[in-house]
Amino acid sequence: MDVDEGQDMSQVSGKESPPVSDTPDEGDEPMPVPEDLSTTSGAQQNSKSDRGMGSNVKVETQSDEENGRACEMNGEECAEDLRMLDASGEKMNGSHRDQGSSALSGVGGIRLPNGKLKCDICGIVCIGPNVLMVHKRSHTERPFQCNQCGASFTQKGNLLRHIKLHSGEKPFKCHLCNYACRRRDALTGHLRTHSVGKPHKCGYCGRSYKQRSSLEEHKERCHNYLESMGLPGVCPVIKEETNHNEMAEDLCKIGAERSLVLDRLASNVAKRKSSMPQKFLGDKCLSDMPYDSANYEKEDMMTSHVMDQAINNAINYLGAESLRPLVQTPPGSSEVVPVISSMYQLHKPPSDGPPRSNHSAQDAVDNLLLLSKAKSVSSEREASPSNSCQDSTDTESNAEEQRSGLIYLTNHINPHARNGLALKEEQRAYEVLRAASENSQDAFRVVSTSGEQLKVYKCEHCRVLFLDHVMYTIHMGCHGCHGFRDPFECNMCGYHSQDRYEFSSHITRGEHRYHLS
C-alpha cells in the first residue's frame, strides 16, 4: 500500500518515482516535493519515509518512539494530553490547507466520515491536519530539544516548561505562605491546603478530606481492605443527594455547637500564644518600627485556622448529641445548675475506688462545658460595674460553686482516659478540692493521696494556689507578673489594671507597651 501511495505522489509532482528496493542506497537524495506540500519539517519527514517499504517505516517509527520515551525519562515534567489537541501548530489557508490535508491523510491519517483524521499508528482522532501533524511527532520526531540536558519535546510550550527546571524559576507563588511552583495547577492544588472546608467526603465512613487524591488514598487503603475481608463499614453509606433545607438546619446546629466548644478551646489557644515571645510596642516610636502586614495577617489567619480545625475535630469526635441538650438550655436556668450540682456533691459520699464504667466520654464533656458556662456566668457577675467592690459573700459563693463543679467533673471522668502522671495529677487536684469543700474554715489544707498535708502558697490577688515555692515566686514578680509597687501592675511593661480580670486578660494577650522617656 505504501508503494502505491509513493507512486501517486510522484505523479502529482510530475516526475517518475525511482525503483523501490529493500535496502535503499545511502547516496540517494530525498524525493523532491512541491513547495506547497513541504511547509513543515513533519511533512518532509513523512515524504522521505514513503521511499522505503512498509516494514522499514514501522521499524523507524518504533525506534523514534523509544527515543521519545527516553527523552521523557530525562526530564519532561508532565505528560502530554494526546487525546484532543487544539489547532495551535503551523496553519495553512486556502488551497494549501486542502492539499496538505490530502497529503497527510495519505501518509499516516485516515479520514473519518465526520471530517476528522485518525492516526494509523495509535488510533487517536484529531480535529484537523495540523493537529495530526503535531501528533505524528510523538511517533517520529521531537524538534524542540533542550540544549542543557538533551530532552526533546513535540511542542514548544513543553520545552519552555522544562527549561524552568534548570533555571529554578517559580513564577506562581502562594500569597499565604512561602510556597512557589512552576505550574498554575500545582498552585491551585496547594491553595486547597489553606482552606478550612473539606469538600471531598467519603460515602463509606463519612470522613472528609481537602483533596480528592487524599480521599482516593483513603478508599484504597481502608475500604478496599474491609470490602475484601467482607467486614461491614463503621456507619452506613451516606447519600450524596441531600435537601437544601436540611443542609441549612445542619449548618445552624453546627454554628451553635461551635460556640459552645469555643469557650473551652479559647483558653488553650491563649496559653499557647502567651508562651511565645512577647511583642513590645512603643507609643512614640511605633511609626518608626518596621511593620510587615503580611506576617501579622498570616499569624491571625493561622490562629483562626488552628481554632477552626480544633473545633471541627472536637465536634466530629464527640458528636452533636452530647452538645445538643446544652443548646436547648434556657438562659434563666444557667445560674441554677451549679447550685444543684454542688448540693448533689455535698450529699454524695466520696468513693475510694475508680468511677464506674458506665460513665462515658459524653458525660465528661457535658460536665466540662457546664462548668465553663458556670465560670463565665460567675465572672460576668463579678466584673459588672454594680459589683466592682469586692464582696466577700459573692466571691466565696462563686468560688464554692466552681470548686463543687470541678469535684463533680473529676468524679465523672472516664477511667480509661486516665493513665500515669495524669492520674496522679487528677487525684491530687481531687484531694485539694475535696478538702476545700468539706471544711470552709480550713479551705487551703491540701492532702496528698498518702494522707500527708502539703504546703500551699496562695496568691491573694489572683486567688491561685501553688504547690511549688519557685512557681509562686515567679508569679509574684521576680520574673514577670505582679509588680512590687502595685499588685495589678505588669512587671514587664508597667501597665496598671483595675482588677484581677483586666490584669489576667493583659497577661494572656501578651502585648506589652513600653513608654520611652
Curated annotation (Swiss-Prot):
Effect of residue 152 to A: No effect on pericentromeric heterochromatin location. No change in DNA binding
Region feature Required for binding PP1CC, mapped onto this chain: 463-466
Processing and modification events after translation: Phosphorylation at Ser-357 and Ser-360 downstream of SYK induces nuclear translocation. Phosphorylation controls cell-cycle progression from late G(1) stage to S stage. Hyperphosphorylated during G2/M phase. Dephosphorylated state during late G(1) phase. Phosphorylation on Thr-140 is required for DNA and pericentromeric location during mitosis. CK2 is the main kinase, in vitro. GSK3 and CDK may also contribute to phosphorylation of the C-terminal serine and threonine residues. Phosphorylation on these C-terminal residues reduces the DNA-binding ability. Sumoylated. Simultaneous sumoylation on the 2 sites results in a loss of both HDAC-dependent and HDAC-independent repression. Has no effect on pericentromeric heterochromatin location. Desumoylated by SENP1.
Known outcome of mutating residue 178 to A: No effect on pericentromeric heterochromatin location. No change in DNA binding
Family assignment from sequence similarity: Belongs to the Ikaros C2H2-type zinc-finger protein family.
PANTHER family assigned: DNA-BINDING PROTEIN IKAROS, ZINC FINGER PROTEIN
GO annotations of cellular component type: cytoplasm; nucleoplasm; nucleus; pericentric heterochromatin; protein-containing complex; protein-DNA complex; transcription regulator complex
Result of altering residue 23 to D: Decreased binding to gamma satellites A and B by 3-fold. Little change in pericentromeric location
Annotated positions of the Phosphoserine modification: 13, 63, 101, 167, 195, 259, 287, 293, 357, 360, 384, 386, 388, 392, 397, 440
One Pfam family in the UniProt entry: zf-C2H2
Assembly and interaction partners: Heterodimer with other IKAROS family members. Interacts with IKZF4 and IKZF5. Component of the chromatin-remodeling NuRD repressor complex which includes at least HDAC1, HDAC2, RBBP4, RBBP7, IKZF1, MTA2, MBD2, MBD3, MTA1L1, CHD3 and CHD4. Interacts directly with the CHD4 component of the NuRD complex. Interacts directly with SMARCA4; the interaction associates IKFZ1 with the BAF complex. Interacts with SUMO1; the interaction sumoylates IKAROS, promoted by PIAS2 and PIAS3. Interacts with PIAS2 (isoform alpha); the interaction promotes sumoylation and reduces transcription repression.
Localization, UniProt: Nucleus
Protein name: DNA-binding protein Ikaros
GO molecular function terms attached to this record: DNA binding; DNA-binding transcription factor activity; poly-pyrimidine tract binding; RNA polymerase II cis-regulatory region sequence-specific DNA binding; sequence-specific DNA binding; transcription cis-regulatory region binding; zinc ion binding
Protein purpose: Transcription regulator of hematopoietic cell differentiation. Binds gamma-satellite DNA. Binds with higher affinity to gamma satellite A. Plays a role in the development of lymphocytes, B- and T-cells. Binds and activates the enhancer (delta-A element) of the CD3-delta gene. Repressor of the TDT (terminal deoxynucleotidyltransferase) gene during thymocyte differentiation. Regulates transcription through association with both HDAC-dependent and HDAC-independent complexes.
Annotated effect of mutating residue 186 to L: No effect on pericentromeric heterochromatin location. Disrupted DNA binding
Effect of a null allele: Defects in hemopoietic stem cell activity. Progressive reduction in multipotent CFU-S(14) (colony-forming unit-spleen) progenitors and the earliest erythroid-restricted precursors (BFU-E).
